[in-house]
Amino acid sequence: MKRIVLIRHGESLWNKENRFTGWTDVDLSEKGIEEAKKAGELMKKEGFQFTKAYTSYLKRAVKTLNGVLDVMDLDWIPVEKTWRLNEKHYGMLQGLNKAETAEKYGDEQVLIWRRSYDVPPTPMEKEDPRSPFMDPRYKGVCEKDLPLTEALCDTVNRILPYWNETIFPTLKEHDEVLVAAHGNSLRGIIKVLKNISDEDIISLNLPTAVPYVFEFDDNLRLVKDYFLGDPEEIKKLMEAVANQGKKK
């Protein structure tokens, strides 16, 4: 049996403030740090022994991964970071409060911006200080690949080459692989793994720092998938994520 565990980063400071974050490099909150430790303890208790891990270029995912691996005494395993696992780019929405934006534009419009498969928010300017074109960490990325906004389909298309060519083939050499990333980048991976339609993927809500396990047979066919943790608690956390973009 082979296993990949997907984990969304712990609560960030902007999650706490209910802001659109996207590619903004926001740190974990104290709660987020504890969530990462708790996830690590849970996976250690369940006997997971990762030998390879992947994460994004954004510190909330990197620090979640580090927190998990530290608790599991797996700090030594190889970790690959890639911009392709970054969160969906929210364009000019980045930094805005989700509930206040819903008050201004309506719940339906904000849901479209947050989750629509093919409708991106208004792009930011290339010269905007928040733009990836102004960020030295993306200096080695081809300019045509850097987004100024994204719909979910763009995020999926960004991730797929790396998933197909790098992460998934890793299972041939490693029995257990951990991917720490973001709500929308993980949503793209899950869409592919479970063959979820464009319409249904927008209603998938991933709570922070809850391990999502995918088990494969030796031919790398998906056998089953499940969240680690109390089902009722996870359901409540999913509902809370769904309500983030609604009016107060």
From Swiss-Prot:
InterPro entries: His_Pase_superF_clade-1, His_PPase_superfam, PG/BPGM_mutase_AS, Phosphogly_mut1. SMART domains: PGAM (SM00855). GO terms for biological process: gluconeogenesis; glycolytic process. The keyword Isomerase applies. Pfam families: His_Phos_1. Keywords: Gluconeogenesis, Glycolysis, Isomerase. Substrate binds at residues 8-15, 21-22, 60, 87-90, 98, 114-115, 183-184. It comes from the Bacteria. SUPFAM superfamilies: Phosphoglycerate mutase-like. The active site is at H9 (tele-phosphohistidine intermediate), E87 (proton donor/acceptor). Pathway: Carbohydrate degradation; glycolysis; pyruvate from D-glyceraldehyde 3-phosphate: step 3/5. Its EC number is 5.4.2.11. GO terms for molecular function: phosphoglycerate mutase activity. HAMAP family: PGAM_GpmA (MF_01039). Belongs to the phosphoglycerate mutase family. BPG-dependent PGAM subfamily. This is 2,3-bisphosphoglycerate-dependent phosphoglycerate mutase. It comes from Porphyromonas gingivalis (strain ATCC BAA-308 / W83). The gene is gpmA.
